[in-house]
């Protein structure tokens, strides 16, 4: 027995405060399922978060009984099947909420007139002009025919003008062809005459050469001379006999050539005439076929335009019934010869006339109806059919052509950009003086002479300066752009002058020319330079500034303002980019023109940017602290 059991038997109560604490049963750290399996991993974490996801065993049985009582108290509303007639000759039924007597009472208004159908507001119809009687229709058709006849006359006039232009062009072409043929016929005759002249000149030159040779020969022996004379006589006789033969043969050949050329030209002219005749025949045939087709079209239009009163009335009824849905109207129209375009044209023509004769006519609507053109609509449909009937190869070819066109456009744009850039680079500075006087040879010679005279004067001045060393040397003139308002310390200038004067005294030369140069330098150093002269000569006194030994470019100089951390330099670079100030990046930042003034200003700018960033950082920190304190205090 335990101590508690003994105390219960003896009816002795124990103070709970003095009792030792009960030992708690140790629960396993890992949860277990009812099957005894332990949960691990993700399932264990979900179990610890959600707990055992088991539905309660006890069901509330009162909910069903409460709902049942509510259902008993609820009374269903009555629904009645009522007839209605949306159109004449049709009677339909639908369910309406409420009793029959109440609905019948609500169907009539206080005056006793029946109320309109509730869903009648959704029955929207197009506003089509009312069709006119037969007399007005006939008047409208007469006006339409007169207007169309005028339009046809204008078209015929334009076609005639076009044909006349074509005929004129053909006649001009024929005249040009005939002129070319005549020129081609004249050219061979001129060539023959030129050949004859060339041959005559050649023969004359040959005769002269032979005579000169015969005169130049020495007469040594009389026998030889006599023999030669005899031979010459014989040769002359032979030549005289042969000349007419050759001339006759030449004339015969020339006549045959002329006859052949004339025959060929006649054949060519006959061929061209035959071709022209064939072309004229084909053109006349084409024109005849065109005239026949135009006449057929006109006859078709005349037959199509003959609309009766009954047909148009039926057309308006169909348009009103089917709300201008033209495929359905064309399908329901009794005349199969009428196309959808014919129906549209007739409907729009009559509507235009009706609207024009109204008192309050809408001009914008009339203009929109007049914009319809039947031949244009037929062409549009034909183009659309051709587009839809394209093969895949044709589509791919068109796409490739579009891509090539775009490439050409891009290449043209690039070329224009490059051309403009080159023009800007090659653009020469505009001269203030007139250059036309130096374009001629006389102007160039004058310019050359002037330059020579100027050079001589300069040499004379130099010789005079050397001969007069006692004159005070004059420094070169200072440009206006070199002036500035910056003040500098003048103590360094005096120190420099003292140092150079002592240096020149130590290095004393015996050469008189060197002495003259030293004297001029001493005089320049003894003279006190002004601020403008210092800027013009580029003199600068560093003072307490430390300089590295050796030669150094100013563009390679490291600015003292750049001795910052890398993060600060990045933020400085971002800010300079926002201000559109060019930088080289990294630690070698420098302006485009690194002069002394620009480098100094650039260093000041970087230092001011660094201080500005520090101030901004401190400001942001203070603002965040203020917001935090306000949120803590609930302000």
Swiss-Prot record:
Sequence similarity: Belongs to the SWC4 family.
Pfam families per UniProt: DMAP1 (PF05499), SANT_DAMP1_like (PF16282)
Main location class: nucleus
Protein name: SWR1-complex protein 4
Subunit (UniProt): Component of the SWR1 chromatin-remodeling complex and of the NuA4 histone acetyltransferase complex.
Subcellular localization(s) per the UniProt record: Nucleus
PANTHER family per record: DNA METHYLTRANSFERASE 1-ASSOCIATED PROTEIN 1, DNA METHYLTRANSFERASE 1-ASSOCIATED PROTEIN 1 FAMILY MEMBER
GO cellular component assignments: NuA4 histone acetyltransferase complex; Swr1 complex
Organism per entry: Candida albicans (strain SC5314 / ATCC MYA-2876)
Known function: Component of the SWR1 complex which mediates the ATP-dependent exchange of histone H2A for the H2A variant HZT1 leading to transcriptional regulation of selected genes by chromatin remodeling. Component of the NuA4 histone acetyltransferase complex which is involved in transcriptional activation of selected genes principally by acetylation of nucleosomal histone H4 and H2A. The NuA4 complex is also involved in DNA repair.
Gene of this entry: SWC4
GO molecular function, one term: transcription corepressor activity
């Amino acid at each position: 027995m335990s101590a508690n059991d003994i105390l219960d038997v003896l009816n002795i109560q124990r103070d709970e405060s003095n009792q030792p604490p009960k030992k708690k049963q140790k629960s396993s750290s890992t949860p277990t399922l009812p099957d005894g399996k332990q949960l691990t991993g993700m399932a264990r974490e979900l179990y610890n978060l959600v707990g055992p996801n088991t539905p309660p065993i006890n069901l509330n049985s009162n909910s069903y009984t409460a709902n049942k009582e509510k259902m008993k108290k609820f009374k269903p509303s009555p629904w009645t099947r009522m007839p209605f007639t949306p159109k004449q000759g049709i009677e339909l039924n639908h369910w309406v909420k409420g009793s029959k007597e109440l609905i019948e009472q609500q169907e009539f208004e206080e005056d006793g007139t029946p109320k309109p159908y509730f869903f009648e507001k959704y029955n929207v119809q197009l506003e089509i002009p009312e069709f006119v009687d037969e007399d007005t229709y006939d008047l409208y058709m007469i006006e339409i025919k007169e207007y169309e006849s005028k339009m046809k006359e204008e078209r015929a006039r334009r076609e005639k003008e076009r044909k006349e232009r074509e005929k004129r062009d053909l006649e001009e072409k024929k005249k040009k062809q005939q002129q070319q043929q005549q020129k081609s016929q004249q050219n061979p005759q001129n060539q023959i005459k030129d050949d004859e002249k060339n041959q005559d000149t050649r023969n004359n030159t040959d005769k002269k050469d032979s005579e000169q040779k015969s005169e130049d020969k020495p007469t040594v022996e009389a026998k030889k001379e006599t023999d030669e004379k005899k031979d010459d006589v014989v040769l002359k006789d032979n030549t005289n006999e042969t000349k007419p033969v050759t001339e006759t043969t030449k004339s015969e050949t020339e006549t045959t050539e002329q006859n052949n050329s004339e025959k060929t030209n006649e054949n060519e002219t006959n061929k061209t005439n035959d071709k022209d005749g064939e072309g004229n025949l084909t053109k006349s045939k084409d024109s005849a076929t065109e005239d026949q087709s135009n006449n057929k079209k006109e006859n078709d239009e005349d037959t199509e335009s003959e609309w009766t009163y009954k047909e148009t009335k039926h057309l308006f009824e169909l348009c009103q019934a089917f709300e201008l849905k033209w495929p359905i109207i064309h399908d329901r129209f009794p005349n199969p010869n009428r196309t959808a375009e014919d129906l549209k044209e007739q409907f729009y023509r009559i509507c235009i006339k009706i609207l024009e004769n109204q008192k309050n006519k809408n001009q914008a609507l009339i203009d929109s109806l007049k914009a319809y053109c039947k031949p244009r609509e037929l062409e549009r449909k034909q183009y659309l059919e051709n587009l839809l009937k394209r093969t895949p190869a044709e589509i791919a070819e068109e796409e490739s052509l579009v891509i090539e066109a775009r490439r050409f456009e891009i290449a043209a744009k690039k070329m224009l950009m490059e051309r403009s850039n080159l023009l800007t680079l090659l653009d020469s500075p505009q001269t203030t003086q007139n250059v036309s006087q130096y374009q001629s040879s006389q102007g160039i010679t004058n310019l050359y002479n002037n330059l020579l005279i100027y050079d001589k004067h300069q040499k004379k001045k130099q010789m005079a300066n050397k001969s007069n060393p006692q004159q005070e040397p004059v420094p070169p003139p200072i440009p206006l752009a070199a002036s500035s308002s910056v003040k500098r310390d003048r103590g360094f200038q005096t120190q420099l002058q003292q140092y150079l004067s002592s240096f020149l005294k130590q290095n004393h030369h015996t050469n008189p020319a060197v002495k003259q140069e030293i004297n001029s330098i001493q005089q320049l150093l003894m003279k006190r330079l002004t601020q403008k002269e210092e800027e013009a000569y580029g003199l600068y006194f560093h003072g307490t500034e430390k300089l590295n030994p050796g030669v150094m470019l100013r563009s390679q100089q490291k600015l003292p303002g750049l001795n910052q951390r890398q993060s600060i330099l990045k933020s400085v670079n971002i800010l300079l980019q926002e201000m559109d100030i060019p930088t080289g990046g990294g630690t070698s930042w420098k302006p485009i023109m690194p002069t002394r003034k620009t480098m100094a200003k650039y260093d000041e700018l970087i230092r001011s940017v660094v201080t500005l960033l520090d101030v901004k950082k401190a400001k942001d920190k203070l603002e965040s602290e203020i917001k935090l304190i306000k949120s803590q205090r609930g302000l």
